[in-house]
């Protein structure tokens, strides 16, 4: 069982306890800090919708430290980021791999950041299926459709030619923050909050 720190704050009615993630949510900070799967994706989507309802004009900050995961779960988060009214700034801490890298580059243009020693990785989707030959063929065709979709999304957000994206994603493609910036996955590399505040002006 993982331990989640509790923050205790004084209020006019006594003390109030929050888990650390709920407290950060009050500051409009969302953490994507594990494998992307359906349950966590639903929680992230709910947080995005809640923050939009609370203030549709105020920016949201998404911190990403994820090895990636299920494509459909990641696309649920991605689509919600594009759907809501607030701008979503993204920041890679540690790693943003596979679907994590799509969420990173899917942030608001000019507000996609990486810390200096993060790693970013893109690649084509993978899948495995057992069953009848016809069913295997159906799933293979679906995987190819998803591959084309992801290539188009990366092309859109990096502003690179689709052919270059396809070639770059054929195998696991690890990048430093500098390489990710050159590729178009992030806009800036930041080493301190002061730098981020300066860039936001």
Curated annotation (Swiss-Prot):
Any GO BP annotation: protein quality control for misfolded or incompletely synthesized proteins
Signal peptide: none
Top-level taxon in the UniProt lineage: Bacteria
Gene Ontology MF terms in the entry: ATP-dependent peptidase activity; ATPase binding; serine-type endopeptidase activity
Coiled-coil ranges per UniProt: none
Reactions performed catalytically: Hydrolysis of proteins to small peptides in the presence of ATP and magnesium. alpha-casein is the usual test substrate. In the absence of ATP, only oligopeptides shorter than five residues are hydrolyzed (such as succinyl-Leu-Tyr-|-NHMec, and Leu-Tyr-Leu-|-Tyr-Trp, in which cleavage of the -Tyr-|-Leu- and -Tyr-|-Trp bonds also occurs)
Principal subcellular localisation of the protein: cytoplasm
Cell compartments where the protein resides: Cytoplasm
SUPFAM superfamilies: ClpP/crotonase
Transmembrane annotation, as ranges: none
Subunit structure, interactors included: Fourteen ClpP subunits assemble into 2 heptameric rings which stack back to back to give a disk-like structure with a central cavity, resembling the structure of eukaryotic proteasomes.
Function (record text): Cleaves peptides in various proteins in a process that requires ATP hydrolysis. Has a chymotrypsin-like activity. Plays a major role in the degradation of misfolded proteins.
Protein name as catalogued: ATP-dependent Clp protease proteolytic subunit
Taxonomy of the source species: Bacteria, Pseudomonadati, Pseudomonadota, Alphaproteobacteria, Rickettsiales
